[in-house]
Amino acid sequence: MEIKEISVPQQGVVADYMNGKKEIQSCFDYMLTEDAFKQRLHDLREREFFRQDVVAHLLEYNTKLQAGESTLQNVKALGDENTYVVIAGQQAGLLTGPLYTIHKVISILKLAKEKEESLGVKVVPVFWIAGEDHDMDEINHTFLAKNKKMKKTIFYDRNPKKASASESELSVEDCRNWIEEIFKTYPETNFTKDVLKFVDDALEKSNTYVDFFAHLITKIFANSGLILVDSHHPELRKLEIPFFKRIISKYKEVQEGLRNQQEVIKELGYKPIIETKSHAVHIFMEIDNERVLLEEHQGKFVGKDGAHSFSYEELIEEMERNPARFSNNVVTRPLMQEYVFPTLAFIGGPGELAYWSELQQVFHTVGFQMPPVVPRLTITYVERCIATDLFDLQLRESDPFLNDVDKLRENWLSNQIEEPIDNHFEKAKKEIADIHTSLQQFVKKIEPGLSAFAGKNELKINEQIELLERMLKRNVEKKYEVQLNKFRRIQFALRPLGAPQERVWNVCYYLNQFGLDFVDRVMENPFSWDGKHHVIKL
């Protein structure tokens, strides 16, 4: 493998944050400097954590996942007051979801190791599975290349319900059939059978979406020391109840903190992305087997548009009696992570970084500092055949990342022709239109009854011109079919659906192409945290 870095333009909060703009950096409590990380360590040492309870739960959970010894040792290390975590999280996507989930894990593993060495303290990597999430449309699919098109393939649950990913049962046989259909679109390689068995072993041990995700991530990162936590696990939820009570008691201050911080963001010229109702409590409650966001109305906590109502005392009692009924939303999830773990750094994608900029005053409301927020590593893989296509088309490696591939294709095609087809036909259409306008005026003057026919005559002439243009383009494209297919392959591989590769492609494609140790070999590469995009030639 060969790794290169390129600067890819970013926008909004992310761009200004990475460029060191003081105004947006003031929305975060720590800058990304070594001194700031030392200050973070000092601040964490001033706080108390219920480490032993968390360790007991994580040992049981990761042992059930058959995690490696390095993971279990890292869990035990969390019991020591001088151990800290680098954390990231994601929904439990089928087959681990898009590549950026894998890249988040790589990011926390890399940063944890680097900070352990530079700060001289134990730092362990933790991945927070958003098991409470109930939006199945976010996790029930993957993308694949089929019939020269990128297509979304959805796993249709035969018994869908508005439950969390931790509680949504997965039909193993149906999912196995779905996975086999996906692998049929991959090239048959020496690794295919092993990868299918690898995935099936994880599936066989799973009852829910989170189970499948957790088993697969554990197997992919078997010897890395990665710790997994299911945010909706009932045993974890018991440990979180004191903080849920704090959120309920401070829900007005939490909402006010969010609104005030969003006003700061607006004044800086950014558009807030967290949308909440004015009376939101920022806690979900399971009601009638559905996850319902609570709101406050006239001193009562209500759900389902008032169909269910609770007093403060009733809600607290229910939390103590049935803690698993409660879960966080986008605002309180970061707070809960901060409550549970001694977080040295949080790693997030561009969207997460933007919405975390809206949470500073919310953190302060509950007595926390926002941890250092580190943008995750961004990575694109370039297979040898794609590198060859780029070379054959005389494109630079950075071109597909800095330009629209369709535009590159059009420019290349135009350069193969003496005169651009579009320009020539536009000129012809304009000249014909001018001539026909004069002709129609003449017809109307001589015989007004033929005016409508003259108008139809112009339409037919235009139709014939457009038909000629399409036929000419079709013939030209056929002439350069080999080269244009290279553009198609480049787009599928590097910018599928016009998006970054890591937002569309799934890791299983690369495991199938390069073997089960693919991710391990990726992690051997040196990565930097300067916001540049990493291009890895395979």
From Swiss-Prot:
Similarity section: Belongs to the BshC family.
Keyword Acetylation belongs to the record: no
Keywords: Coiled coil, Ligase
Annotated Pfam families: CC_BshC, Rossmann-like_BshC
InterPro entries: Bacillithiol_biosynth_BshC, CC_BshC, Rossmann-like_BshC
Regions annotated as coiled coil: 248-268
EC numbers for this chain: 6.-.-.-
GO molecular function: ligase activity
Keyword flag Lyase: no
Gene (name only): bshC
Role according to the record: Involved in bacillithiol (BSH) biosynthesis. May catalyze the last step of the pathway, the addition of cysteine to glucosamine malate (GlcN-Mal) to generate BSH.
Protein name stated in the entry: Putative cysteine ligase BshC
